[in-house]
Amino acid sequence: MKVLMFGWEFPPKIYGGLAVASYGITKGLSLQNDVETTFCLPKPTGEEESFLNIIGMNQVPVVWRDVNYDYLKSRLPNYMTPEQYYAFRDHIYADFSYLNVNDLGCMEFAGGYPANLHDEINNFSIIAGVVARQQQFDIIHAHDWLTYPAGVHAKMVSGKPLCIHVHATDFDRSRGKVNPTVYATEKNGMDYADCIMCVSELTRQTVIREYHQDPRKCFAMHNAVYPLSQELLDIPRPEHKKEKVVTFLGRITMQKGPEYFVEAAALVLKRTRNIRFIMA
């Protein structure tokens, strides 16, 4: 099975949990003998691991440019060959000459989450139309709302099933103060999706209730964890003879629930004083 996957970040460039989750699922799929994954990123670093195929959307042309082979070879990064560039160029499907493109006819991406994020999401989906016309694949997988438009476009072009991966909803990120533009993007992706993967049952229920999705196409798939390496296991554990230590490991954001940690600490410390709470 060939998977065409759209994601917004991937190690070694990590902005948050999305990169780690994207790595985990693609690494797991790579261990299956019958699965081949092509991962589309706005702006790869060129240092991504080689267990999957990387497509840099910033190297896929959307405007025809008559570029010779030697010049291409000098301009393209290590994850794109001139042959691949020409193959994509042959699948430009509309006149995008009004867009801001470079000398190769490609759109540039800032990477990460710039001020013009919604413009970059739209550009990403335009390029997805070229990729979906050129690539051979059996299923589409889109990570989070940023790539839902790309996934929907790829489905409309290819007719292949779309699976979207809901790492979080805007209800989770905003404590209920939902951005209507983000909500519309999320809901449109869910409406077009053939299946909706949610990171928890709580997220699944939010998708069903707030986005009015059919429960039959929504399922929870929890993020996995890797066992610790022997090198880490061999590190001597510190002895806390007088204190017990409770650690909060996570970003200090509403979504991770740090206030619950503080509230729990206050309750515990009313009963005992030999516990140290650490936010790391």
Task: Report each predicted region and the residues it spans.
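Nucleotide-sugar donor-binding and catalytic loop/hinge architecture
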Residues: 1, 231-245, 269-271
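Carbohydrate-associated surface elements
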Residues: 202, 224
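Membrane-proximal helix-turn-helix segments that form the acceptor-binding/catalytic region
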Residues: 129-134, 156, 179-196
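Conserved donor-binding/catalytic core segment of Leloir-type glycosyltransferases
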Residues: 239-256, 262-265, 278
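Active-site proximal beta-strand in glycosyltransferases
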Residues: 3, 139-141, 148, 152-172
